[in-house]
């Protein structure tokens, strides 16, 4: 579901990748980056699908309006749980460059974009820019510079989605 791919595990992804940023568990971090990239692809595909169904079927467009508060409440619950997970992970203190407050801001920042992608306005407060600037280099495969013999190739994800696909082409 969209909540799973857009919000759930983002705190864990960021925490795990903070270790990589601190030159710890680099091998695991590379695998986690691949999993993160896969989740982002799923999120983008699911957002596209939600938007297409709403655009092409008036019944779904009507249902979206009728159920918006209920749908937002579901996403808000997941967001609240992710913030609780950040508090739990850092109850004994921060790691270099990361703490619960930064992660909770990151959850809010991520929520704004993810909800906007499906036509829902985030009702919380969020920073205007990412509180974890290094996170995107783990999402964007074009920013990785590794020799193929040193890492798995992530080229398979380039060009797999098109937002110009028409329903009849499917």
Across the structure, where does each feature detected by a protein language model lie?
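Non-heme di-metal
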Residues: 1-170
């Amino acid at each position: 579901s969209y909540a799973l791919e857009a919000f759930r595990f983002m705190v864990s992804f960021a925490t795990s990748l903070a270790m990589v940023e601190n030159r710890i568990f680099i091998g695991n971090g590379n695998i986690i980056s691949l999993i993160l990239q896969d989740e982002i692809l799923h999120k983008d595909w699911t957002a596209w699908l939600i938007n297409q169904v709403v655009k092409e079927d008036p019944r779904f467009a009507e249902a979206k309006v009728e159920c918006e508060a209920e749908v937002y409440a579901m996403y808000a619950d997941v967001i609240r749980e992710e913030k609780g997970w950040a508090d739990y992970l850092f109850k004994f203190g921060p790691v270099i460059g990361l703490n619960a407050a930064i992660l909770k801001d990151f959850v809010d920042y991520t929520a704004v974009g993810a909800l906007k992608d499906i036509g829902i306005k985030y009702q919380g407060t969020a920073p205007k820019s990412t509180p974890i600037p290094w996170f995107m280099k783990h999402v964007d495969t074009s920013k990785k510079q590794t020799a193929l013999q040193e890492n798995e190739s992530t080229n398979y994800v380039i060009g797999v989605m098109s937002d110009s696909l028409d329903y009849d082409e499917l």
